[in-house]
């Protein structure tokens, strides 16, 4: 079995479906004997360029270990899911379980937002 990192971008109007999509893809991997090493929901972010006249989209990253057939099934699911705008699969040398630099940035932004809301208005 090989290690893969999959990043997919979901239409912003379908953001409420993201948890169900993550569970579906995790279920596909585990049902076929694979392992999900890391799941990161990066949230709604600004895209580098417009896709279907959209400036923002919901980003998700999965690090999995699976065989080629499972990967093909997941990628086929992406192609037939209209909510998925783009996806990218990268073969990795080993399993990545530590938070990605992108997730660290998301956590830092969330901490800054919560700190601003907790500060009393003067």
Swiss-Prot record:
The keyword Glycosyltransferase does not apply. SUPFAM superfamilies: Ribosomal protein S6. Signal peptide: none annotated. One of its GO terms (cellular component) is cytosolic small ribosomal subunit. One of its GO terms (biological process) is translation. Residues 106-122 have a biased composition (Basic and acidic residues). Keywords: Ribonucleoprotein, Ribosomal protein, RNA-binding, rRNA-binding. It comes from the Bacteria. InterPro entries: Ribosomal_bS6, Ribosomal_bS6_sf, Ribosomal_S6_plastid/chlpt, Transl_elong_EF1B/ribsomal_bS6. GO terms for molecular function: small ribosomal subunit rRNA binding; structural constituent of ribosome. Residues 96-122 are annotated as: Disordered. It holds the Pfam family Ribosomal_S6. HAMAP family: Ribosomal_bS6. Belongs to the bacterial ribosomal protein bS6 family. Binds together with bS18 to 16S ribosomal RNA. This is Small ribosomal subunit protein bS6. The gene is rpsF.
